Amino acid sequence: MSDNNEKQTLRTVEGRVVSNKMDKTVTVLVERQVKHPLYGKYIKRSSKLHAHDADNACNEGDVVRVTEIAPMSKTKNWRVVEIVTRAAV
C-alpha cells in the first residue's frame, strides 16, 4: 500500500509472571494506573496477557518485558523479550 519502508513501533509492556503451567506460554499480569475522570483519584487497573516463552525460562514471580506480535493462537499474541528481574526463590 505505502511505499515507505518505515518500521512500526511495537508495543512493549512490563509485567509479572503469574502462571507458567503451559508449555512455552506464560501468563503475564500487567498493572497500570488510570486517573478517574470525575474524582481525579488514581485507580489500579490490570490485564492478563498470554505470552510466548520459547525456552520455558520464566518462572512465577519474574518481572518480564513482552512485545506485541502477530497472533500465534486464539489468545496468544505477545512474546517475552527479556526477563527484567528473577523471582526470589
Curated annotation (Swiss-Prot):
A molecular function annotated in GO for this UniProt entry is: structural constituent of ribosome
Which GO cellular component terms, listed alphabetically, does the Swiss-Prot or TrEMBL entry include? cytosolic small ribosomal subunit
For this protein, the record's InterPro entries field holds: NA-bd_OB-fold (IPR012340), Ribosomal_uS17 (IPR000266), Ribosomal_uS17_bact/chlr (IPR019984)
Q: Give yes or no: UniProt keyword Zinc-finger.
A: no
Under the heading Pfam families, the entry gives: Ribosomal_S17
Which SUPFAM superfamilies would you find in this protein's record?
A: Nucleic acid-binding proteins
Instruction: Give the record's keywords alphabetically.
Output: Ribonucleoprotein, Ribosomal protein, RNA-binding, rRNA-binding
Keyword rRNA-binding on this protein?
yes
Q: Name one GO biological process term.
A: translation
Subunit and interaction comment: Part of the 30S ribosomal subunit.
What exactly does this protein do? One of the primary rRNA binding proteins, it binds specifically to the 5'-end of 16S ribosomal RNA.
Family, according to the entry, reads as follows: Belongs to the universal ribosomal protein uS17 family.
Checking PANTHER family in the record gives:
40S RIBOSOMAL PROTEIN S11 FAMILY MEMBER, SMALL RIBOSOMAL SUBUNIT PROTEIN US17M
Name of protein: Small ribosomal subunit protein uS17
